[in-house]
Amino acid sequence: GFKDGAADRISHGF
């Protein structure tokens, strides 16, 4: 996601 963390940094990486 946007600022969701480690797993989501493949998509956004904040």
Curated annotation (Swiss-Prot):
One of its GO terms (molecular function) is neuropeptide hormone activity. The keyword Translocase does not apply. The modification Phenylalanine amide is found at F14. GO terms for biological process: neuropeptide signaling pathway. One of its GO terms (cellular component) is extracellular region. Keywords: Amidation, Neuropeptide. To insects allatotropin. Has a stimulative effect on the contraction of gut muscles. This is Myoactive tetradecapeptide.
